[in-house]
């Protein structure tokens, strides 16, 4: 599209207001109920069942303490009637086993239902979010979406939402149920104690609420910081060839590192808030204990209750308070999910009714003739309010072909966009058969149009599916007929899998001509009344253009056709040519009429003339006919595109990608990677150890009080209980600093670890050779997913969980020591049951490990589908392919959704089983205590102290093992991380013992070079290629599509290494030279220049980071870019937009040339640098290139042969060999020569 129209001066104030509005929007979070707005009837049933299971599960612990209290009362009075009381203890022990079964079933139901509904709802959210994005009009993508992170919301944000909807809701319900059940039982037992505790609860709630609010705010800011870092990574990896060519790896890593520093600062604040929040909560609970113990002793001494009831009430109330504290992390996760959900729900909520009306409202016509009229149309792009058209009027007669030509920025492509109703006129009307297109049903209207653009957007699916986008319900016969009409059937059938061949991300498996013919087949299948050709052959070489043009000629018959073309040879036979300049019609007429006038059109044509060859047309015509069928297979076989078919990829994956790492080795690697944070880990561990030791000592205090309650002397009860109450109050004072120490330093360690993992990953990714990026599994979407999701999993599942593990380890060691000290028999029996708990959780871990891998990869594939659709939104909108894309996205999500049922039940069963075995252990232990007391082998006080601390130990073991799912996920994420970190690149940019390059003369020689792409080793690109360009000279490489032209440049840049032979620069094998220092002497200008989402100034400076402002401006002047830059309102500070979208093709190319000028290279590599430009832009760019080429060794690949006539040497490639070599004049004099035939195809006159 002509982007000059949008590169004019923008309304800065409007953009500023939009940014402020976005900032305000980002601060929002959805309501708690809003999280579940994607639920259907089955989800409501699952949530109801899961909620019931979670609540019952939570209530079993308070009920456990009821039976426990009865058993304690029996044990305390055992001496009165040993036989009867022992029988009562046995009965209550059996009741505990029954309660354990209830716990087992409820835990199973709760975990499985919430895991399943979380997966289902999030999958639906992802689908609805993508549907809403695809339903937006193009203006949204030009304005609001330019700086947003749409893909981030569908991947990372969705994971946070799923976590909140699933596991964390289950946890919160369970803990809240435990809290409520504990207080209810407390009121029924000793209402005075419970009522007193209610006075403390509001303080705990305020502390927890404040903590949740602070964490929500910090997490929102942290999410934004990580999204910015992800955007940097995505931009770099999507343009990795440019980054490598300009030795920009270090700058990219530095930029990524700076983005991560913002998140690290927020992480410190998060740790501080977490430490203070959790510490304050536990401090209040300890103080509550002190108060309750003192008041309970008062009630016991005055005969208001007995020791067992008092103790049961205290246990229920206190453990219920602990449950409230344990719910805090899950509440924090839900708060994060609410923040993450805001962007997702806002897109869904604001779009559905609006988009539905926009697409489906309006009238349809019975018959469409195809007459199009522009009546006094005025238009300005929403993102750039300068007028493109003012009162533009013209008429395109039905069934006729109209071509629009003109300089860059004249509005050619804008006409095609407006005909498709991507934009609405500011004033005036666009009519179809006399009807304003605004009044027509948009979906129906676009079905009447068929679009073929310059760079056809193909999707990462089969050829058949890509053609099927043209007509949703077409059958295979219709697809084949459309392919035949587009001259595509023969080359498709020659492919290994025919119409089921995967085309790869962006269609990278196919050559330009093949992609274009598939796009034409897509348009043919649609059988449109109106055909729109937007520079449909401008990026093709002469041979491919001839075949594609024949296909277009077939399709254009009897259809209204609008053509925008840079190559004027393609529009010579159209019915009428419309010449645009400055948004106005300057000339209209046929080719011959306009040539006779000698106006703008004639000037453009003269610029494109090549040397006429009188006798070559018939020769080439015959040659093309013979090659039309066979050349297609050659183009696929030797395509310069670097990706392979997916079936080949599966066979040729690098060994390193298959390498498995054991969990222990990965954990050890992680520890080594985290070595700089060991001091933080030590300080955090001190806090965790102290926090862990508090709990068994706390249990000892309780047991001490319990013993005192059964004392017959009131003074003893008063003295002992007050002593414990004072100790607990003191513990409350020191608890806050202990938890602050633990959580602040562990969070700091985790944040620094994830920053280091992300940075190490990013650096490792950028050290790999280009061939590695060509693998489908290493596409940009997958790599950004590893950087974001997997690095986050490593931190949350391992670093964050380490805090809990150390705390519980301290707790377990302290508890076991105390238990064995007081009663080794009781401790031995209860401890003997622990292996059962561990075995149950290990079974759960093994099953989780089996399902997790496919689950992770499926999300990556789905994200790639979404990313591709959003990147090609104009094609999606033009073909009304929203439904097909959504169905493909749904298909990619279906596997993890189906697995959620199985994984949920396995996880729930494993966790429920561990809970059941825990209750059985307690029942066995209490029964055994009664036996020992009955046989006088221990006393009540010692056995209860031993048993109490073991209860706490069992809970800590269960809690630690409950972290198994998160740890397993983190371990799997570590596998992805270390597979990248441990991979040895095939082409090292800093090879040891390589020779530094300080100066390059520029003599380049290919010596018997053979080459195959690493992803498709069975296809030869070059066989013993010999080619040389002398220092300071220029070499033009031409040939049919797939002959290896661009591969020559790829090898010189050392994106790939030859399979055999040598590539030498100044007589030195390129493999012996330091790659970074060599690339600093080379400059690459590509067909589609890769600009970064920063200012024009910074894009030029990318060529030389040490350049001064004056040098940058001089480079821009040399590239004929200075004039258009200073005309912009912000001049050199103008933002180029994502991938340079705010600039026209010619402007982008001149900025890229300025970047190359600033590099001051010894060798210049031009890969089709002007092929995608219109004539006016090409002239300016060619002038800049001519200046740049002087005195430099230059290798240029060009489709337009007029651009290479001045080259010192022209080499013609065919089937991987040089078939002709010489100057332009020498080669055109060879009768029936390859070069002569190629030039004849591009004659205009």
From Swiss-Prot:
Source organism superkingdom: Eukaryota
Chain residues that bind ATP 2: 1039-1046
Start and end residues of each stretch annotated as Disordered: 1-20, 610-660
Matching Gene3D superfamilies: ABC transporter type 1, transmembrane domain, P-loop containing nucleotide triphosphate hydrolases
ABC transporter domain span: 372-607, 1004-1240
Pfam families attached to this UniProt entry: ABC_membrane, ABC_tran
Provenance organism: Arabidopsis thaliana (Mouse-ear cress)
Keywords (A to Z) from UniProt: ATP-binding, Glycoprotein, Membrane, Nucleotide-binding, Repeat, Transmembrane, Transmembrane helix, Transport
Record's bilayer topology term: Multi-pass membrane protein
Protein name, UniProt field: ABC transporter B family member 13
PANTHER family associated with the record: ATP-BINDING CASSETTE TRANSPORTER, ATP-DEPENDENT PERMEASE MDL1, MITOCHONDRIAL
Annotated positions binding ATP 1: 406-413
Transmembrane feature ranges: 48-68, 94-114, 171-191, 195-215, 276-296, 314-334, 686-706, 725-745, 805-822, 828-848, 913-933, 947-967
Segments of skewed composition (Low complexity): 630-646
InterPro entries documented for this protein: AAA+_ATPase, ABC1_TM_dom, ABC1_TM_sf, ABC_transporter-like_ATP-bd, ABC_transporter-like_CS, P-loop_NTPase, Type_1_exporter
Domain ABC transmembrane type-1: 47-336, 681-969
Compartments, record wording: Membrane
Family assignment from sequence similarity: Belongs to the ABC transporter superfamily. ABCB family. Multidrug resistance exporter (TC 3.A.1.201) subfamily.
Residues the record marks as carrying a glycan: 77, 351, 391, 778, 1008, 1106
């Amino acid at each position: 599209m002509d982007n000059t129209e949008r590169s004019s001066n923008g309304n800065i104030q409007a953009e500023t207001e939009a940014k402020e509005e976005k900032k305000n929007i980002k601060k929002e979070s959805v309501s708690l109920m809003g999280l579940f707005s994607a639920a259907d009837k089955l989800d409501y049933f699952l949530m109801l069942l899961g909620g019931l299971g979670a609540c019952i599960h939570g209530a079993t612990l308070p009920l456990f303490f009821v039976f426990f209290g009865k058993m304690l009362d029996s044990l305390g009075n055992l001496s009165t009637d040993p036989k009867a009381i022992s029988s009562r203890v046995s009965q209550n022990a059996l009741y505990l086993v029954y309660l354990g079964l209830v716990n087992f079933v409820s835990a199973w139901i709760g975990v499985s239902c919430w895991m399943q509904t979380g997966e289902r709802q999030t999958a639906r959210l992802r689908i609805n979010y993508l549907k809403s994005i695809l339903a937006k009009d193009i203006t949204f993508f030009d304005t609001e979406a330019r700086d947003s992170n749409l893909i981030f919301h569908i991947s990372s944000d969705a994971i946070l939402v799923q976590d909140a909807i699933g596991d964390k809701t289950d946890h919160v319900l369970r803990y809240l149920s435990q809290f409520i059940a504990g207080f209810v039982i407390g009121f029924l037992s000793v209402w005075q104690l419970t009522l007193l505790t209610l006075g403390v609860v509001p303080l705990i709630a305020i502390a927890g609420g404040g903590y949740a609010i602070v964490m929500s705010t910090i997490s929102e800011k942290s999410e934004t910081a990580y999204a910015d870092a992800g955007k940097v990574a995505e931009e770099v990896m999507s343009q990795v060839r440019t980054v490598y060519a300009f030795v920009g790896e270090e700058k990219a890593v530095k930029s990524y590192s700076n983005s991560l520093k913002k998140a690290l600062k927020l992480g410190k604040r998060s740790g501080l808030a977490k430490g203070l929040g959790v510490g304050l909560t536990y401090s209040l609970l300890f103080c509550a204990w002190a108060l309750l113990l003192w008041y309970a002793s008062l009630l016991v001494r005055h005969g208001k209750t007995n020791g067992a009831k008092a103790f049961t009430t205290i246990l229920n109330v206190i453990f219920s308070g602990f449950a409230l504290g344990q719910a805090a992390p899950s509440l924090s996760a839900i708060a994060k999910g609410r923040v993450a959900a805001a962007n997702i729900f806002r897109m869904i909520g604001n779009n559905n009714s609006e988009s539905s009306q926009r697409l489906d409202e309006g009238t349809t016509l019975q018959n469409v003739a195809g007459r199009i009229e522009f009546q006094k149309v005025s238009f300005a792009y929403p993102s750039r309010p300068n007028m493109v058209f003012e009162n533009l009027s013209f008429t395109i007669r039905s069934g006729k072909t109209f071509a629009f030509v003109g300089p860059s920025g004249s509005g050619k492509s804008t006409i095609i966009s407006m005909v498709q109703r991507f934009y609405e006129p500011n004033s005036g009307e666009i009519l179809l058969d006399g009807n304003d297109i605004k009044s027509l049903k948009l979906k129906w209207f676009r079905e009447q149009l068929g679009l073929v653009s310059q760079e056809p957007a193909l999707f990462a699916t089969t050829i058949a599916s890509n053609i099927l986008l043209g007509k949703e319900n077409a059958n295979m016969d219709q697809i084949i007929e459309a392919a035949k009409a587009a001259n595509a059937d023969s080359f498709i059938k020659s492919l290994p899998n025919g119409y089921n061949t995967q085309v790869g991300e962006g269609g990278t498996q196919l050559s330009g001509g093949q992609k274009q013919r598939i796009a034409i087949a897509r348009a043919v299948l649609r059988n449109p009344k109106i055909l729109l050709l937007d520079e449909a052959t401008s990026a093709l070489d002469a041979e491919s253009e001839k075949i594609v043009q024949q296909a277009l000629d077939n399709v254009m018959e009897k259809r209204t056709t609008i053509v925008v073309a840079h190559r004027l040879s393609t529009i010579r036979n159209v019915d009428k040519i419309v010449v645009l300049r400055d948004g106005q019609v300057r000339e209209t007429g046929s080719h011959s009429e306009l040539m006779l006038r000698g106006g703008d059109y004639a000037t453009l044509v003269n610029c494109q003339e090549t040397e006429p060859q009188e006798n070559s047309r018939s020769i080439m015509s015959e040659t093309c006919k013979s090659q039309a069928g066979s050349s297609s297979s050659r183009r696929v076989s030797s395509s310069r595109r670097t990706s392979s078919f997916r079936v080949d990829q599966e066979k040729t994956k690098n060994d390193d990608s298959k390498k498995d790492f054991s969990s222990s080795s990965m954990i050890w690697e992680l520890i080594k990677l985290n070595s700089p944070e060991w001091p933080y880990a030590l300080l955090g561990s001190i806090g965790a150890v102290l926090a862990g030791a508090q709990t068994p000592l706390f249990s000892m205090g309780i047991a001490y009080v319990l013993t005192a309650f059964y004392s017959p002397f009131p003074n003893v009860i008063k003295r002992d209980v007050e002593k414990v109450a004072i100790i607990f109050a003191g513990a409350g004072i020191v608890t806050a600093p202990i938890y602050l120490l633990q959580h602040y330093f562990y969070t700091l360690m985790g944040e620094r670890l994830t920053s280091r993992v992300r940075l190490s990953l990013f650096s490792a990714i950028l050290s790999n050779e280009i061939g590695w990026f060509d693998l489908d599994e290493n596409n940009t979407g997958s790599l950004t997913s590893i950087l974001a999701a997997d690095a986050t999993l490593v931190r949350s599942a391992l670093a964050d969980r380490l805090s809990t593990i150390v705390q519980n380890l301290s707790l377990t060691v302290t508890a076991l020591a105390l238990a064995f000290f007081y009663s080794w028999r009781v401790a031995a029996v209860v401890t003997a049951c622990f292996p059962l708990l561990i075995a149950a959780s290990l079974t759960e871990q093994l099953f989780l490990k089996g399902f997790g891998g496919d689950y992770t990869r499926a999300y990556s594939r789905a994200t790639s589908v979404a990313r591709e659709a959003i990147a090609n939104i104009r094609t999606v909108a033009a073909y009304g392919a929203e439904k097909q894309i959504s169905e493909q996205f749904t298909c990619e999500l279906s596997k993890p959704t189906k697995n959620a049922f199985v994984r949920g039940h396995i996880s729930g069963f494993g966790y429920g089983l561990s809970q059941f075995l825990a209750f059985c252990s307690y029942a066995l232990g209490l029964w055994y205590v009664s036996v020992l007391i009955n046989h006088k082998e221990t006393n009540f006080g010692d056995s209860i102290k031993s048993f109490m601390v073991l209860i706490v130990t069992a809970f800590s073991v269960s809690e630690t093992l409950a972290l198994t799912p998160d740890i397993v996920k983190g371990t799997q994420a570590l596998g992805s991380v270390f597979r990248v970190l441990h991979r040895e690149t095939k082409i090292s940019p800093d090879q040891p013992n390589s020779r530094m390059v300080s100066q390059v003369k520029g003599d380049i020689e290919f010596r018997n070079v053979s080459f195959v792409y690493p992803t498709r080793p069975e296809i030869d690109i070059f066989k013993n290629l010999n080619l040389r360009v002398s220092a300071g000279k220029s070499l033009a490489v031409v040939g049919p599509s797939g002959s290896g032209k661009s591969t020559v440049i790829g090898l010189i840049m050392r994106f790939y290494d030859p399979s055999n032979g040598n590539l030498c620069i100044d007589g030195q094998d390129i493999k012996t030279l330091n790659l970074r220092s060599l690339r600093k002497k080379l400059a690459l200008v590509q067909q589609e220049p890769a600009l970064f989402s920063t200012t024009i100034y910074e894009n030029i400076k990318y060529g030389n980071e040490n350049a001064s402002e004056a040098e940058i401006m001089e480079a821009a002047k040399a590239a004929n870019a200075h004039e258009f830059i200073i005309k912009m309102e912000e001049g050199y500070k103008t933002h180029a937009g994502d991938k340079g979208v705010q600039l026209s093709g010619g402007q982008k190319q001149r900025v890229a040339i300025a970047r190359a000028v600033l590099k001051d290279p010894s060798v210049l590599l031009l890969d089709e640098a002007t092929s995608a430009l219109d004539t006016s832009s090409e002239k300016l760019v060619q002038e800049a290139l001519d200046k740049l080429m002087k005195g430099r060794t230059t290798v240029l690949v060009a489709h337009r042969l007029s651009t290479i006539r001045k080259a010192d040497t022209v080499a013609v490639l065919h089937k991987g060999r040089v078939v002709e070599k010489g100057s332009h004049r020498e080669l055109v004099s060879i009768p029936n020569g390859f070069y002569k035939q190629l030039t004849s195809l591009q004659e205009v006159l």
